[in-house]
Every structure is written in structure tokens, then in C-alpha cells.
Amino acid sequence: MLENYIERNIFRKVYLCEQLFEFQEIDIEQTAISLRVTTPTILHDLESLAECLEYCIKEQVREKHKYKLVFKHGIALSELTQFLYGQSYFLKFLSYYFNGIFTSTELADLEFISLSKVYTIKKIVLDFF
């Protein structure tokens, strides 16, 4: 049910993280095909993933069609996926909703995003119920 509400880029990052954690290397084009997105989308997601998880990356190599990522010893996959899901605006706003913080201006100030984006995400959260 949540998969209908959480942002697609978050799901892609989690999937890429899981694949790289398990296999340490992925084929960029095959991954793009299996996720039904373009190769530049996968490359952008990989770049974003490496940027936000740089504190736990031991080695990162990009070749023409392959991408290799080795995580530091002692890093748990659950820690990585929890961090990635924590970047979801939907989940953040859901948390704010349960904590009684749901005015548009408060949310815009807390997340440093536009009111337009806040209205869009608030609608998604309210549709969830």
C-alpha cells in the first residue's frame, strides 16, 4: 500500500542500494530496463545514492556499462534502507501529521521547500487516509 505513495526515486534508490549491497556491481543498462526507466535516470539515482551515502562507501567505480559500489565493513543494509526511506517527503509529512504539525507554512519552513510542493505532498498524505 505504501508503494503507491512513496516517491518513485526513493524506491529506485533503495532497490539500487540493495542490489549493490548484495552483488557490489550492477549493469547500468540492464537495471534501467528492469526498472523501466532510462539509463540517465539510473545514473542520476546512482550519483545521488553515492552522494547521500558517502559516509559508508569504501569504493566506488563507474565504467561504461557497469557500476561498482563497495560499502564499508560493519554497515547493515537495514541502516542504509532506513536512511534512504527517511528522505521521502511522504513519510516525513506523515510523521509530521501524526505529531500534529501539518500547517503548510510550518512544513515549508521545516523542509525548506516551496508551498506548492507542500500542498502537493499534503494532498498525497490526506489521500492516504
Predicted regions and their residues:
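Short, basic/aromatic recognition patches that contact phosphate-bearing ligands
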Residues: 1-129
